Each structure stands twice: as C-alpha cells, then as structure tokens.
Amino acid sequence: MTKAQFYIEGMTCSACSSGIERALGRKKFVQEVGVDLISKKAFVVYDENQASLEDVFKQIEKLGYQPRVATDTPNTFLNPSFLTPNVKLALVLLGTLGVLALSMFAPLLPLPSFLKNPFINGIVQLVLSLMVMHMGRNFYVHGFKALWARQPNMDSLIALGTSAALLYSLVLLFRAYTHAPIEGYYFESVCVILLFVMAGKRVEENSKDKALEAMQSLMRHQSLNALKIENGQSVEVPLESLQKGDILQILPGSYIPVDGVLFKGEAEVDESMLSGESLPVYKKEGMDLFAGTLNTTTTFQMRATHTKAQSTLAKILTLIAKAQGSKAPIARLADKVAGVFVPIVIGIASIAFLVWLVLGDFTRALEVFIAILVISCPCALGLATPMALLVAQKEASLLGLFFKDAVSLEKAKNVNHVIFDKTGTLTLGTPLVQEVRVAEGVDRLELLTLCASLEAQSEHVIAKGIVAHAKEQGIALQEVQEVQAKPGFGIKGVVGDQIIKAGNLEFFNLPNPFGTLEGIQVFVGTETQILGVVVLADSLKEGSKEAISELKALGVKTTLLSGDNLENVRALATQLGIQDYHAQAKPEDKLKVIQELKAQGKVVMMVGDGVNDAPSLALSDVGVVMAKGSDASLEVADVVSFNNDIQSVVSAMKLSALTIANIKQNLFWAFCYNSIAIPLACGVAYKLGIMFNPMLASLAMSLSSVSVVLNAQRLRGAHFKIRGSHENRHSS
C-alpha cells in the first residue's frame, strides 16, 4: 500500500470533501481516504499494484475538482493571473449594480430611451449577467460535474438555482423579441445570488487564511542554508548537507537551522514558536538550541546534534500535516449530514415547485424552487467544526501546545483522571547537588574535585549534575586514567596516584559513616575508605504545584507513577499534594494502573516523556508528552507540550472545553437556520405575508455561513484567557 498526500482545488463546502471521500472510498484499490476542506489537503492510501496516483487524480477530476501534488503550502497553486478573487468580486459587484440599475431601479434612473425597450434592456442585462456568471464559473463547472457524478454539493444548488433563473429569463427575452408582454426578467436574481455567495466565500477564505497563518508561518522559520565552519572559515552550505557534530555560525537576526547546543559565545534566542513565550531566552555554552528559533542579539557558534529531518521543527511540521488530515467524531457526524443534505434539498425544491405549479402560479413556483436551492446552506454545517478546530490549533500553538489530531482535542475536555510520570515531567530530570559531606580531615573542594573528575568520564545524568556543580564552583578537573564503569553501582579510575571510586554504598561494601540522608547519594572514596558523599536531588519544575492545585479545583483526580524509590516518590507526592502514588513502577505496572482506571469508567490522561512512558501514553485516552521526550513517546502521544510546561495539561483541557462549546454553538445555529429557512422558502408562511425571493434567500445563505465562521473566530484570544486564569489563581 502507498500513501499519497496532495491538495485539492475547487472545494467550497463539506459536501464537496465528503463527496470526494465517498467516491474514492468506493474504489477497490483505495484502502483509506481523508479530505480536509479548510487546508485543502487530502491523503489516499491505495494499492500501487492496482492503480497509480494518476488514476486517483482522474477520479477526483471527474467530480469537477483539481488535484495538485503536495508542496510546502496550499497557496502555491492559486491562480496568479489578473483575475484574483478580489478582482472577480469587484467585477461581479459592478455587473450586478448594472443589472439592478436596468431592472429594479430603472424607473428611478434617467436611462437612455433605447434602454426602455424591454428587448434591448433584456439583452444588456443578459450580457452583464453572463459576465457575472463567468466570474463565478467555478460554481457551474464544479456543481454540474458533481451532479453528474451523483455527488451534489453546494455548488450544485447554486448552479441549478441560477441556471433555472437564467433559462426562464431567456424564455422571457424571446417573448420580448416577439413583442409579447412580460412582467420582468430574473437576471437580477442570478447576479445578486452570485454576488452574495461570492462575497460570503471571500469572508470565509480570509478567515481560513488567518487561521492557517500561524501554522504556515512555521515554514518560514526553516532556513534553506546554513553557515558551516570549515578550516576556520564560515561557508554557506545547503541545510540538507548538515551532519551531527558540524560547527555552525549563527548571525543576529537569523533562524537557527538545526537542533544543537551553543558551542562558543552566548545569545538571547526567541523561542516563541515553541513555547508561546514572547521574551527571549538567555543561552550560554552547552545549552540546547532548537531549529526555527530566532537569534536576536550576538553572533555565536553552535554544534549540530540533529540533522534537518530529525529537528524539533521537522517533527512539528510532520505533526501538523497529520493533524490537518484528521477529523473529530463530531466533525464526521456533520460531514455525514452534509453529504445527504444536498440531494434532500433538491428533492424538497422539486416537490415545492410542483405543488406551486399545481396551484397555478408558475412564476411563484419558479421563485420558490430557486429560493429553496439557494437558501439551503450545507456550508454552515460543514464549516461549523473545522473552522473552530483550526482556530483552536492556532491558539494551542500560542500556548506551546500541539494536538496531533482532532480526536484528542475533542477528548481532552472529558478527562477526569491524570497520571503523571515523575522524572522530566513533574521534575526537571536533571539532579542538582544539594550538599557535600566529608569525613574528618578531608577538604570539601578536594573531594568535589576527585568526584567531578571521575564523573566527567560518564554520560550518566547524575554524573552531569556533579560535573556542572563543580564547574560552577570554578574547579579545574584532573586527568583520570584506567576508567572502569560498573552499571548500577558506580565508576572508578586512577586520579593522580590513587584509585578513586564514586557510586552507591553497595559499590564500596563499607559501612555508611554519614547516617540517613534524603536524596540521591554518591559516595566518594578509595578501596578501603569512604572520604565523603555528594547528595543530589531532582528539582521540582516551576508550576508543577500550581498545576496539581488547578486540576483538583477542576475535580480531576491525580496519580504519580514513577520508577524511583519509595522515599523519593513519597516525598514528591507529599510536596505536590498527590495522595495516590506508586513507586518503582515498571512500564507494565503503569499499563496495569491505566487499565484499572479505564475499567472504572475513568477518562485517563497520561503525562510523561521517556521511552518507558510510550506504552502508557498509547493506552491512555489522551497522552501528553513533553517536547524533550523520546522519539518513541513523541510518536504515540496525542498532545505535545513544546514549552515543557506542566501547566500545559490544564491548558489542554480548558482549550478543549472552549473549542467543543464553540463547535456546539456553530452546529446549533446551522441546524436551526436550515430547519427554519427551508420551510419559509417553501412558502409555508405565505398566508402571513412571509416569503423569500431568490435574492433574499442568497443573502440569508451567505450570512449563515459567515456567522458560523465569525463565531469560530471568537476562539481567537483563548490563550490569553487560559494564561490569565493560571496567573489569577497563582496570585490568589
């Protein structure tokens, strides 16, 4: 099976996207298909032995749409000609005003005498109407092709309604040519309908572009070239050629090309595209740098630790591509309704036409037929969910969050139990030296020098904490010979003229001269004597305590699961106010806890970052991973916190609740609108003097979809509200 991603031009409503999905889904060579109306992206999983991508494209073209091979952005295939959407809309407006001047407003205007001739007046209206229809020709091309393929959409409704008005106007024009009396033409209905529909579409497209802007801007953070240091000189090279270990020069105002560490110098880096925080982050030698972030101040050198394809930015862009093709359950329901909506509307319009025709009023029958086709709005149904989800994804990015699919964004609001891993999630994951104790007669700095010199030979996280502390103290490390590491116990080597060991108490097999100590203990000594002990502790992440408090306030239960020893886990749980905790938990133990909670009917969120968290993240209802997590955990998680902030858990739940509430408002409005508008267009309130003519119907339809789009925009600024709620709670 082969998976292909591409763009589809010409879709206007969810009936279009769902129609493409149904048409392709019926083909034997297609295993899976997904089409996103907003981003215009599509993917197809097909059997390459039975068909090619060209065959897939032919099926789409039969429906009246134009597939395009995927590039960096869906906007690259837009027509760059003079007839831009805004120019088309302006020409439609001018043409419509001309037709209205010749029809509805003719008695009020000083028109030339020859235009008062019904036939000549009709010919001029026809010419102007044909120009307007040409500007909106996509409605007819897509609409009639979709109708012919038995996948009618909103374009089909517009095409049928305006074509009926045009054909009847041509009949009236012929009657005017024969000097038969006529009451008027329907050219103004054709033009006004197209004007309102196209104006509504422009508002929708502008809103979509704004919502997509935050995602597409990430593309602009990806450099094409980098300055590589070769033989002491900086040489510009393609980004794809960079390898791990390459030394790069970063100039002020340039984007960091790949992930790495600061090698020489210092800098302030704008990491807002990852964390959502606007203030630059100070960086010194040895600190992490991320692709796509911006160097705001000085020139410095960095060492690449990842290639372009492995960078954090590349992972984000991959996640975005996957997320844009996903649909939430609530969106699938709306798509199903929209898929059958158009055929039902055509049926209702046809029945209403026949009823009014039987009543002996052909003109009224035609107006009702056109009004029903035009007033019905599958767009409102189709846009209700994807627009809200798209705006929510943008707001999530401003919170340093990314939802990998629409399903997780919908689920997060229902979470009622959160399980936390300890190291790297609630804590920094980098043990820091808390105290150094020495035996009688031993110098503290000398002991720290011996320990750090030895630990510098190890890549263990505890060793790094000790070495970092020694460097902060200004200690110069000594050379170590004959280094031997014993996993699970410690390390030893020759420093100067003596054998020095550093590790746990079992490594020495000697009594502990310092008594009970809390934290991670690294004993230092010779083969026969313990000279001292370095005590380390993993520091609590900023905001961890506040996040747990907020979850409690929301009525969400919390559990701490860790592979650490009972003493450390209990101490952390007590500090955070978590009553349910499990120590020395293996990956299978974590799975068991999640299974038990789910069996009790709990909606479980797992928050972690390590390789051993990957199975738990996959099993939970919503898996949240810190961005510095392993590739395995990033792959299976549902939500990624790129700012490594534990409060992202609360933010994800709050944003989910706001988004689903907005979607429900949109769907409620869309269903109510269609439930009321269609019967009124049928003429059920005719006796009360309420009747929609085609022009009013088109205005109502356009306002319906525009109102849904504008309501979705109310989610903009949600990140301010969520951040504000955190700050207000912490200050109180």
UniProtKB/Swiss-Prot annotation:
Gene Ontology biological-process annotations: copper ion homeostasis
Enzyme class: translocase
UniProt topological domain (Cytoplasmic) ranges: 1-88, 143-149, 209-336, 384-663, 714-732
Transmembrane spans: 89-109, 123-142, 150-170, 188-208, 337-359, 366-383, 664-683, 695-713
Bilayer topology: Multi-pass membrane protein
Extracellular membrane side: 110-122, 171-187, 360-365, 684-694
Database matches in Pfam families: E1-E2_ATPase, HMA, Hydrolase
Gene Ontology terms for molecular function: ATP binding; ATP hydrolysis activity; copper ion binding; P-type divalent copper transporter activity; P-type monovalent copper transporter activity
Record-listed Mg(2+) binding positions: D609, D613
Catalyses which reaction(s): Cu(+)(in) + ATP + H2O = Cu(+)(out) + ADP + phosphate + H(+)
GO annotation, cellular component aspect: plasma membrane
Binding-site positions, Cu(+): C13, C16
Active site: D421
Subcellular localization: Cell membrane
SUPFAM superfamilies: Calcium ATPase, transduction domain A, Calcium ATPase, transmembrane domain M, HAD-like, HMA, heavy metal-associated domain
Keywords: ATP-binding, Cell membrane, Copper, Copper transport, Ion transport, Magnesium, Membrane, Metal-binding, Nucleotide-binding, Phosphoprotein, Translocase, Transmembrane, Transmembrane helix, Transport
PANTHER family: ATP7, ISOFORM B, P-TYPE CU(+) TRANSPORTER
Family indicated by similarity: Belongs to the cation transport ATPase (P-type) (TC 3.A.3) family. Type IB subfamily.
Protein name, UniProt field: Copper-transporting ATPase
Species assigned in the record: Helicobacter felis (strain ATCC 49179 / CCUG 28539 / NCTC 12436 / CS1)
Classification lineage: Bacteria, Pseudomonadati, Campylobacterota, Epsilonproteobacteria, Campylobacterales
Protein encoded by which gene: copA
